[in-house]
C-alpha cells in the first residue's frame, strides 16, 4: 500500500497525505487504505496557512529535506513534494514513522 502513496515524478517524490488539524501533537498516523493517503496530525488550525506551514516544518524534520505542498493547499487532502530523496529513502523513513506498519 505504501508504494501506491509514494510516487516518483520529474521533480522528485510525491506523497499523498490526509491532514487533521487541531491535534494534540504533530505526528504521522496510519495509512488510510480507502483514500490511499498517509494520515498526518497537526496542532495548528487551518487559518491563514498556519497548518500548511506546520506540515512543511514537521515533515522537513522527519525527512531532513526540503518539502513543498504540490497540491491541495486549501484541502485536507494534499500531495507533498520531496525533491532530493529517492523513493526507497522515503518509503524507509515512512515505515519507521507510520503507526500501523
From Swiss-Prot:
Gene3D superfamilies listed in its UniProt record: YggU-like (3.30.1200.10)
Pfam families: DUF167
UniProt xrefs under SUPFAM superfamilies: YggU-like
SMART domains reported in the protein's UniProt record: DUF167
Any Gene Ontology CC annotation: cytoplasm
Similarity-based family: Belongs to the UPF0235 family.
Name this polypeptide is given: UPF0235 protein MmarC6_1603
Species for this entry: Methanococcus maripaludis (strain C6 / ATCC BAA-1332)
Amino acid at each position: 500500500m505504501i508504494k501506491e502513496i509514494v510516487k516518483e515524478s520529474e521533480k522528485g517524490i510525491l506523497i499523498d497525505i490526509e491532514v487533521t488539524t487541531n491535534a494534540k501533537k504533530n505526528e504521522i498516523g496510519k495509512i488510510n487504505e480507502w483514500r490511499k493517503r498517509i494520515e498526518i496530525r497537526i496542532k495548528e488550525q487551518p487559518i491563514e496557512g498556519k497548518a500548511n506551514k506546520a506540515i512543511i516544518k514537521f515533515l522537513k524534520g522527519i525527512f531532513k529535506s526540503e518539502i513543498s505542498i504540490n497540491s491541495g493547499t486549501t484541502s485536507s487532502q494534499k500531495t507533498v513534494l520531496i525533491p532530493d530523496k529517492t523513493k526507497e529513502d522515503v518509503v524507509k523513513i515512512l515505515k519507521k514513522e507510520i503507526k500501523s506498519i
